[in-house]
Amino acid sequence: GIISADQDYYNKAFKQFSKVKSLQNKHSQFNTEFLRTLVFLDKFNEAFSFSQEVWNEEELFFEADLLLGLKYFMERDHINAEKHFKRLNEISYYNPFFRDFIGNVLMAWNEASINNEEESFKYLEKIPKPYDRIIKIQSSFIQCYFNDDKTLLAFQQLLQDKEYNFSRYNFFLINYLLYENKNYEAKNIIKYARGEYSSNLLLKETEFFLLNKKMNKIKSFFNCKKNEDSLAEFFYILANLYSSEKDYKLSNFYLKISLFLNKKF
């Protein structure tokens, strides 16, 4: 089963894992590979169920805590979501990131979902400095979620950072402006952005919709008032990080979660 998963033959791997499912709770690598295979195949309901079967409070299981936390988060069970998200801050074999990164991002959104704006930003402040650009992105989205007066400025400051290619976030600024009924300003942004990033396909598509007055099409892709949409973008970023490191298996894992949270984008 594990060999097939490594070769990305996910359907074959799923069948083989299912035959030897008795290994669960005895073989941690089996649990990890089977859970990832379920995600690769978009079998999220089965992934949630399997996570509940193998979860153990005494043992850190990164993927299981991540999926269970997301399950409870989407069900608006924020107490149980918090329990699992906080465990993601611990360094373990299954947590490839520094302590206090993924868990704090998810906790920030968990607090935002219960309208606790102050606590939401406190969790962002706990994220390690190496991820300061991700902090800026999440901060912009949370400000947008709470309709903060500084949302526009936050997006503008993000785009002014020339040390990193934030061209994608012109779309989110335009999206925000359209929700604020500032169509003229949105058109000015896309005109400038297309001049700067002529090969960006997302911006090219956005320009097409704007020129053809299909503003609702742009708004249908993303809504910062829907926390699942913003979390989907976070997991999209993680997928890109792993892709840049040529770890395509983990990249696909996070990309699948991103698409599960927001199938429209």
Identify the function of each model-found stretch.
Residues G1-Q16, S230-I257, L261:
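Alpha-helical segment of the N-proximal tetratricopeptide repeat
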Residues F14-S18, F44-E57, I79-S92, N116-K129, ...:
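Alpha-helical repeat scaffolds
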Residues Q24-N31, E58-L67, Y94-L106, P128-S139, ...:
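Generic helix N-cap/helix-start motif at coil->alpha-helix transitions
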